[in-house]
From Swiss-Prot:
<keyword id="KW-1278">Translocase</keyword>
<comment type="function">
    <text>NDH-1 shuttles electrons from NADH, via FMN and iron-sulfur (Fe-S) centers, to quinones in the respiratory chain. The immediate electron acceptor for the enzyme in this species is believed to be ubiquinone. Couples the redox reaction to proton translocation (for every two electrons transferred, four hydrogen ions are translocated across the cytoplasmic membrane), and thus conserves the redox energy in a proton gradient.</text>
</comment>
<dbReference type="GO" id="GO:0005886">
    <property type="term" value="C:plasma membrane"/>
</dbReference>
<feature type="transmembrane region" description="Helical">
    <location>
        <begin position="359"/>
        <end position="379"/>
    </location>
</feature>
<dbReference type="InterPro" id="IPR001750">
    <property type="entry name" value="ND/Mrp_TM"/>
</dbReference>
<comment type="subunit">
    <text>NDH-1 is composed of 14 different subunits. Subunits NuoA, H, J, K, L, M, N constitute the membrane sector of the complex.</text>
</comment>
<dbReference type="GO" id="GO:0048038">
    <property type="term" value="F:quinone binding"/>
</dbReference>
<feature type="transmembrane region" description="Helical">
    <location>
        <begin position="487"/>
        <end position="507"/>
    </location>
</feature>
<keyword id="KW-0472">Membrane</keyword>
<dbReference type="InterPro" id="IPR010096">
    <property type="entry name" value="NADH-Q_OxRdtase_suN/2"/>
</dbReference>
<feature type="transmembrane region" description="Helical">
    <location>
        <begin position="44"/>
        <end position="64"/>
    </location>
</feature>
<dbReference type="GO" id="GO:0008137">
    <property type="term" value="F:NADH dehydrogenase (ubiquinone) activity"/>
</dbReference>
<keyword id="KW-0830">Ubiquinone</keyword>
<keyword id="KW-0997">Cell inner membrane</keyword>
<dbReference type="Pfam" id="PF00361">
    <property type="entry name" value="Proton_antipo_M"/>
</dbReference>
<feature type="transmembrane region" description="Helical">
    <location>
        <begin position="307"/>
        <end position="327"/>
    </location>
</feature>
<feature type="transmembrane region" description="Helical">
    <location>
        <begin position="117"/>
        <end position="137"/>
    </location>
</feature>
Length: 519
C-alpha cells in the first residue's frame, strides 16, 4: 500500500489552526493544576494570546502565492488567510468579553475556552477546504464545539433548550449538505473542487436533474449555517439562550467561515454550470433575508433577539455580494429582481474581485461591530433575570450615558456601524457591497438592500435613544467594572471609527485576498 508522501511544508499553512488546537489542549490540561478563581484568569489570557498568535500567523501568509496543502484537500491562499484573521479577531474579542461574564456565574473553566479554540480552528480549516468531505468534517468540528458552548451554562432551561434546538436543526442541515455533496460526487466522480468544473459541465448535458438537486441541497445546508431566510428559524432562540460571549463568536465566526466555504464551493461549481441559476438562487435568498431580517427585528424589545434578527439581515447583505459573483459579463441579461447586464464595460474579473472585496470587508466590519455590541449586552445583563427573559430588555439601556458614558459611546458607535451610518466601518462595508452589486448590474437588488438598510436604522437608533434620552431607572444597580470587557470595547470602538474614516490600512489585504477572482 502506498502511503501519502507528506512533508513539513504540507503542515506550515495549517499553523494558525494548529496553534489554536495546541492552545486548546494546554487549556484542558491546565484544569488539573488550576483550582482558584485568580489562577483561572490565566486561561483567558492564554486564549487571547493564542488568538493573537494564530491571527498574526495568518497575516504572514497573506501575500504568499496560493498552494494546495494536505494532498489537495485544502488550499492556502490570501482568501483563506484573511478569513482566518477575521475569525481570530472575533475569538480574541469574544474571549475578553467572557471573563467577567463567566466569573459572575461561577462558570470559569478551561473547557469553555478550549471549546472556543476548537470551534475557531474548525472555522479556519473550513475556510481552507478544497474538497467536499474535508469541508463537511470541518463544518462538524466547528458545529460540535458550538453545540456544547451553546448549552455550557447549566443553570436554568434556556441554555439547554437552545443547545438542543441548535443540535437538532444543525444536524439536519449538515445531513442535507452531505446529501447534496453526495449527489455532486455522483454526477462528477470527484469531491475535489478544483477538478469539478469539467465533469459538471459534462453532467449538465447528461443528467442535469442530479446536478441541480445537488446544488440546491448544498445551498440549503449553507443557508442554514449563515441564517438565511427561510432557514433562519433557529437563530433568535439559540442566540438568546446561549451565553452572550458564545453568541458573539457564533454570530461572526460561523458566519465568516460559512460564507468563505460557500464562496469557494460555488466559485468552482459555477465554472461548470449555468451561472444564471446561481445568480437567481442567491438573489432570491438575499432578497428574502434582507427584508425579513429587518422587519422581524423592528418589534423586538429583547436586545439579544433584536441582534439575532439583525444578524439575519446582515447575512442578506452579504448574499448580495455572493450573487454579484455570478454575473457573467457584458451581453448577458439577467432580469431577476431588476438585474441587468454588467454595466459600464466593467471587466468580469474586476467585477468579481470587487464583490469579493466587499464580502471580506463586510465580514471584518461586522465582526468588530457585533462582538462589541454583544459585549455591552453581556455586562448589562443580570444572572437572576436570565431565566425570566428580562435580562436583555431594552430598558436595561435606559440612562446608560449617565451611568457609563464610555459604554454608551461605544454602543452608539456599534449601532451606527451596524446601521451603515457614516463615518463608521459599517458604512464603508455596505458601500463596497452595494457598489459591487451596481457594477454587476444588480440594480433592483441594490435598491432593496438600501431600503432594507434604511429600515434597520430605526431599531438601531432606538437603542441609542434609550441610552442618551431616557432617565436612569429607579433602583438601578451599580454596574461592575471589567478590565477585559472594557479592553474589548476600546479595541472594537477604535476599529469601528478609525477604519470607517481611514479604510486604507486594510485595503491592501483586501486587494490581495480578492485576487483569486481577478483572473
Amino acid at each position: 500500500m502506498n502511503l501519502p508522501n507528506l512533508s513539513l511544508a504540507d503542515f506550515l499553512p495549517l499553523l494558525p489552526a494548529i496553534i489554536m488546537v495546541v492552545g486548546a489542549s494546554i487549556l484542558l490540561l491546565s484544569e488539573v493544576f488550576l483550582s482558584t478563581t485568580a489562577s483561572r484568569a490565566y486561561q483567558a489570557v492564554l486564549t487571547v494570546v493564542t488568538a493573537v498568535a494564530a491571527g498574526a500567523m495568518a497575516l504572514t501568509t497573506m501575500f504568499e502565492p496560493p498552494q494546495e496543502v494536505m494532498l489537495g484537500f485544502g488550499v492556502m491562499d490570501p482568501f483563506s488567510s484573511f478569513l482566518t484573521f477575521v475569525v481570530c479577531v472575533g475569538l480574541g474579542l469574544a474571549t475578553l468579553s467572557s471573563v467577567s461574564f463567566l466569573r459572575k456565574r461561577g462558570a470559569e473553566r478551561g473547557e469553555f475556552y478550549a471549546l472556543m479554540l476548537f470551534a475557531s480552528a474548525g472555522m479556519s480549516l473550513l475556510a481552507m477546504s478544497n474538497e467536499l468531505i474535508t469541508l463537511f468534517v470541518n463544518i462538524e468540528v466547528l458545529s460540535l464545539s458550538t453545540y456544547a458552548l451553546t448549552s455550557y451554562l447549566r443553570r436554568g432551561t434556556r441554555p439547554s433548550e437552545a443547545g438542543f434546538k441548535y443540535f437538532i436543526l444543525g444536524a439536519f442541515s449538515s445531513a442535507v449538505l452531505l446529501y447534496g455533496a453526495a449527489l455532486l460526487y455522483g454526477a462528477t466522480g470527484t469531491t475535489h473542487l478544483t477538478a469539478m468544473a469539467g465533469p459538471l459541465s459534462t453532467a449538465m448535458s447528461s443528467q442535469p436533474g442530479l446536478v441541480y438537486a445537488g446544488i440546491i441541497l448544498v445551498i440549503t445546508g449553507f443557508a442554514f449555517k449563515v441564517a438565511a431566510v427561510p432557514f433562519h428559524m433557529w437563530t433568535p432562540d439559540v442566540y438568546e439562550g446561549a451565553p452572550t460571549p458564545v453568541t458573539a463568536l457564533m454570530s461572526v465566526g460561523v458566519k465568516a467561515a460559512a460564507f468563505a466555504a460557500m464562496v469557494r464551493v460555488f466559485f468552482m461549481v459555477g465554472k461548470g454550470v449555468d451561472p444564471q441559476m446561481l445568480l437567481g438562487l442567491f438573489s432570491v435568498l438575499a432578497f428574502l433575508t434582507m427584508v425579513a431580517g429587518n422587519l422581524l427585528a423592528i418589534p423586538q424589545r429583547n436586545v439579544k433577539r433584536m441582534l439575532a434578527y439583525s444578524s439575519i439581515a446582515h447575512a442578506g447583505y452579504l448574499l448580495v455580494g455572493v450573487a454579484a459573483l455570478f454575473v457573467t459579463g457584458p451581453g448577458e441579461q439577467f432580469r431577476l429582481l431588476g438585474a441587468s447586464a454588467l454595466t459600464g464595460g466593467t471587466p468580469l474579473g474586476l467585477a468579481r474581485a470587487e464583490a469579493l472585496r466587499g464580502i471580506l470587508y463586510y465580514l471584518l466590519a461586522y465582526t468588530f461591530s457585533a462582538v462589541g455590541a454583544f459585549a455591552i449586552v453581556s455586562v448589562l445583563e443580570r444572572r437572576e433575570d436570565e431565566e425570566k427573559g428580562t435580562a436583555w430588555d431594552l430598558e436595561r439601556f435606559s440612562g446608560l450615558a449617565q451611568r457609563k458614558p464610555g459604554w454608551a459611546f461605544a454602543m452608539a458607535a456599534f449601532m451606527l456601524s451596524l446601521g451603515g451610518i457614516p463615518p463608521t466601518i459599517g458604512f464603508m462595508s455596505k458601500l463596497l457591497i452595494f457598489q459591487a452589486a451596481v457594477d454587476a448590474g444588480l440594480i433592483g437588488l441594490t435598491i432593496v438592500g438600501v431600503l432594507s438598510s434604511a429600515v434597520g436604522i430605526y431599531y438601531y437608533l432606538r437603542v441609542v435613544v434609550y441610552m442618551f434620552m431616557r432617565p436612569v431607572p429607579e433602583g438601578a444597580q451599580a454596574l461592575e467594572k471589567s478590565w477585559s470587557t472594557e479592553l474589548a470595547l476600546v479595541l472594537s470602538t477604535a476599529a469601528v471609527v478609525i477604519l470607517g474614516i481611514i479604510p486604507g490600512p486594510i485595503m491592501g489585504w483586501l486587494e490581495q485576498a480578492s485576487s483569486i477572482f481577478g483572473q
